[in-house]
């Protein structure tokens, strides 16, 4: 009888999967091995990224009975959530992102009297900062910018449209933008796209990325529309979104951070596979390996001492004893325990021991497998994240590096200096607030940095503003 055949996936060619006709028994066996491998070692991380040839495919969602088109983020529209998961699963990338966010935050967003280095003390400004927790909004903002290279802030105006009364950060992972029209997206949809419903989605008009303040003034009828030369009627909208994006090649609607290369090449997977491989190696070899010699009379002696005469029960008792010996030698909780057994002597004075246990490979040391490779992978991840390994602690692995204090100070100062461009982009919404509220002539915005000093200055650090 001819064996039933089936298709076995053997490779990929672009958008096509390659199959071969194989006996069903072979297909079942191979797929079982593939499933077990994926369970232990996971998929390639690059698989979460879409290779779609279309730059801005659109989907539609109905909100309050009105259809809204949006550009999905990734092939399944869940790419930012996948990025969160991938970063969170790796201790190097997690710590690098935390470090990047903290360094970019610096001393936080601060307001100064224009023309001086004195902190602003205006009651109205201080009340505005307090009621909107601008320090927290700014921290959330720079965190999103480090993860996704853009951030979105929602501003809410008073009913008469004369003041900004509320500022709220919108998580970038929840933001989906409208398709571009004349180079601009008209709105942003904010929702948890893992379980989005029309009732939980929020649509916000998106101000022009280049000139958000001018766009706001036009929408409120305060300035003429550059396209028509006339003033519009004041819009009924009182909430608007401001997008701050780090420039990237191609200016895609969702910026592609440079550090995404850790998934598009091999280093993220190399680090993960090394850790997974070491875990299973330790799990399968950590228990001591023993050779146990048991006298042929030992089993009968055990049964006789316990007065077991039934043949079936004797076999059960022998099986139980074998299991007890195995567990004693292999289980970690038995380390350091003693096992007491009896022995006899013959007339010649020779000892006859019932049980002998020998440790095999007792002098062999293990655990150093792939240590250098793990350090190399960790350094590669830090490089892609723009963080020197010494800035976040010693490189994970057995090979440690330790720069001098001067080197670490210069590395930290260099890292802080590179945040200037990020601060310029992140501060755009706050300049909009300042101009709209009429504070621009009295106050200025600065994001002071922490700069390490030398010991001869008798100070540990100093604050420098940009």
Where in this protein do the model-derived segments appear?
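C-terminal anchoring/interaction modules
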Residues: 2, 327, 413, 417-466
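Short glycine-rich, low-complexity/disordered patches
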Residues: 63, 97, 102-123, 139, ...
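Conserved aromatic-histidine-acidic binding/catalytic patches
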Residues: 87, 97, 109, 113, ...
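Long amphipathic alpha-helical segments
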Residues: 182-211, 284, 288, 316-402, ...
